[in-house]
Amino acid sequence: MVSASGRRVLVFNGEIYNFTELHAELEQQGRAPAWRGHSDTETLLAAFEAWGVEQTLKRARGMFALALWDRQNRTLTLARDRLGEKPLYYGWQMQGQQPAFLFGSELKALREHPSFAGEVDRSAVCLLLRHNCVPAPYSIYRGISKLMPGHYLTLTEADLQAQRLPASTPYWSLAEVAVAGVAAPWQGSDDQAIRELDALLRDAIGQQMVADVPLGAFLSGGIDSSTIVALMQAQSSKPVKTFSIGFDEAGYNEAVYAKAVADHLKTEHTELYVKPAQAQAVIPRLPTLYDEPFADSSQIPTFLVSELARKSVTVSLSGDGGDELFCGYNRYQMTAQLWNRLGSLPLPLRRMLAGGINLLSPTQWNQLARKLPGAGSRYVNLGEKLHKGAGVMGARSIEDLYLGFVSHWPDPASVVIDGREPPTLVTGNRPDLRGLDGVQQMMALDALTYMADDILVKVDRASMGVSLESRVPFLDHRVVEFAWRLPQSLKLRNGQGKWLLRQVLYQYVPRQLIERPKQGFAVPIDAWLRGPLRDWAESLLDESRLRQEGIFQPAAVRQKWNEHLSGKRNWQHWLWDVLMYQAWAEGQKK
């Protein structure tokens, strides 16, 4: 869209939720153009004209990737939303003799340009093996970067002529928000905090419910999605459309909990029980959906619930972000507790303990766990957890311990031929988080990396793949900033995370419908790889094929594959990383 003055041109992907407020502010200041319509795009353009780039970005609330061309100054500005809900790729490419600066919210668009070289960056493959995704600012292609969340990048005409890439500029920083919040914590009472969070979430959800197309929500029956749906229903005169999927496999089905919450809130609920064959049929579509290799296997149920929702609605709200903001992941407590116990033990003794754990396979530990009194959900996947713990007993600090828990392949450069693992916010270029304790640092790093590069990527690509727009109310920056001001006692109390968020939810949903062990959104990839997916995986992991392609060390991959097939170890996550790269690379040949 071209601005009313004709000076600026905007290419925009996303939504500005407070555009009516910006529209009114422009009117009040006498800086509004002669409006041609009522869109957020036109309002955003007018805001750029009136307030400039940085002030407009600071005022806007939404999810977006945008490019703004200033015809007068001949500058190009790229910008991305605060938390990274929408992707933005950019970089110089030269195939043949013609260099070009390329940018877009999809790699598919860049690949269509004649100057696009398409050379795989082996450093990015190393990152994939550690994190199951390629974190910003890296991409799978050499010379192409992702703009960091909360940043903008301005290229002058001189930059474009000299083929330079200036550094990007932050207009909002989650790390700074975290440090400032911990330094000046909330001073109110518990009841005041409950009321404040309720009001903030209501407003964020209310703004994101504004749509001229059918709207609904994903509902798993967990704390986060149930809170979103409860506050949607509280503001709606009609039943909210909610969606969930279920699996018949024990330990993987949350649909029964979602239905109980939906029945209580009286939503218009749709559920689909997915057969293994239906879930497995999604796998060939994943490389196209995700643009670059992406190996979080919960991408499968995420796509399926998006596909289900799209049959009824065009926009769906999700509960992503609650774990990182309100201390929801079990690993936060587990890592801190484990370090408190292990930190005082001599390193040789810890290594002996690890060796003892590894004497039994995860399957054998699970069999023993089922014989313990009160087994049930308390010891689900105990073997995998023990082996994960054994793998990090050599940690020399709580930071090393955290890295061990969030890593798949511990030394990716030894698996990727000619690969060198570059630093990330987790492994080297850590942000300044002074004043935060160990648990708070893990929460901040998760929000900066795992949430931005895994969770939000998973949801955005899966939903956009079926033309469904996903919105994430927890990531309204006002909610994020308030969450970081909350003392840890309002997040973690009596050994339970999300204390404050639970209190908000209990105003709408009885606690007996919510209180249960955290389950996650997973599929039984480990069993599928030994069963119906075995031939597909064997083809992609064929030793001669790996040797010919020259990306992965065949011996390292085949060892994991053989141990997995035998049941000796569960290497599903490690193998899924390699398989998703292989499937993606195969798709690029077509």
Predicted segments with their positions:
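Conserved short loop/turn motifs at secondary-structure junctions
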Residues: L219-S220, G246-F247, D323, L468-E469, ...
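Active-site adenylate/phosphate-handling loop in enzymes that bind or generate adenylated species
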Residues: R82, L304-Q364, S397, Y450, ...
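DNA-processing P-loop NTPase/helicase core
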Residues: Q367-L368, V380
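Short low-complexity, flexible loop/linker segments enriched in glycine and/or proline
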Residues: P284-T288, R310, Y332-M334, W528-R530
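Adenosyl-5′-phosphate
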Residues: R31, E112, R142-M148, L165, ...
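Cysteine-centered catalytic environments shared across enzyme families
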Residues: M1-Y290, T302, S306, Y506-Q507, ...
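A conserved catalytic-core signature of glycosyltransferases
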Residues: V11-F12, A124, E196, A295-I300, ...
